[in-house]
């Protein structure tokens, strides 16, 4: 076995830093770079061959979405290596960054709703999501927990720079041109904002306004807005029914 293969086939020196329903995330040094490893679980309830095939397809879709997002001008972690047999993606660890959810929790409250701060967040998220959707990239889990703010201090707030907003966790991402999928992606964001950041109820409307400004195909954007209203209505009906 070659030296790089030995390194690639174990987690020695990597620290488990997160675990979700689909994967474990490790942090360590790979080829001299601070690196994250995302390792997808085996699903024991599925047939082994089916599980292997579905997991490989999911990893390929995730990597494809990350690469396309970067090509669209959206900041994402760089992919270093992919090991389909080990169900792993080795990717860049983003330094000097804070999760957007934590940033909002720290900086914004009901008493101190800073328009400059909210406009900065709306400008960043609205622009980034418009870039993704304009290239038919559906994130699938667009929440403030899946956005990092990089190199942010008080001097940066109010000065939107594309690379300040880094989109992470493309585990549910796919490529799809339908207005329905884009509308649902937006609705997921709206629901997450209302749940996690009820102190800023107008944030989504600000994001949606910027999104419409930056979506490249204006005629399709009108269709997305219309479809979003339908999706929103369906969601409200489900909430009422329970």
Q: Can you say where each PLM-predicted feature lies in the sequence?
A:
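Conserved hydrophobic alpha-helix
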Residues: 69, 125-132
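Juxta-kinase regulatory segment immediately upstream of eukaryotic protein kinase catalytic domains
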Residues: 1-15, 231-239
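Catalytic-loop of the protein kinase fold
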Residues: 134-144, 149
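ATP-binding glycine-rich loop module of kinase domains
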Residues: 13-60
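Activation-loop N-terminal segment of eukaryotic-like protein kinases
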Residues: 149-162
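C-lobe/activation-segment region of protein kinase-like
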Residues: 159-242
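Conserved structural core of kinase catalytic domains
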Residues: 41, 55-59, 70-122
């Amino acid at each position: 076995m070659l030296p790089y293969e030995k390194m690639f086939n174990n987690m020695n020196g990597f620290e488990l830093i997160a675990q979700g329903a689909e994967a474990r995330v490790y942090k360590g040094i790979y080829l001299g770079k601070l690196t994250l490893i995302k390792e997808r679980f085996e699903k024991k309830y599925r047939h082994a061959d089916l599980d292997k095939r579905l997991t490989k397809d999911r990893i390929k879709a995730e990597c494809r979405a990350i690469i396309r997002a970067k090509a669209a001008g959206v900041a994402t972690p760089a992919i270093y290596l992919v090991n389909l047999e080990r169900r792993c993606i080795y990717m860049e660890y983003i330094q000097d960054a804070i999760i957007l959810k934590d940033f909002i929790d720290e900086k914004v409250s009901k008493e101190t709703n800073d328009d400059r701060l909210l406009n900065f967040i709306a400008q960043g998220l609205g622009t980034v999501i418009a870039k993704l959707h304009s290239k038919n990239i559906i994130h699938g889990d667009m929440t403030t927990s899946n956005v990092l703010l990089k190199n942010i201090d008080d001097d940066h707030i109010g000065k939107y720079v594309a690379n300040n907003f880094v989109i992470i966790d493309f585990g549910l991402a796919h490529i799809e041109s339908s207005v329905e999928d884009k509308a649902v992606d937006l609705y997921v964001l709206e629901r997450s904002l209302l749940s996690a950041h009820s102190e800023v109820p107008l944030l989504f409307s600000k994001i949606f306004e910027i999104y419409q400004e930056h979506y490249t195909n204006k005629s399709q954007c009108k269709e997305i807005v219309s479809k979003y209203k339908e999706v929103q209505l369906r969601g409200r009906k489900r909430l009422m029914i329970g």
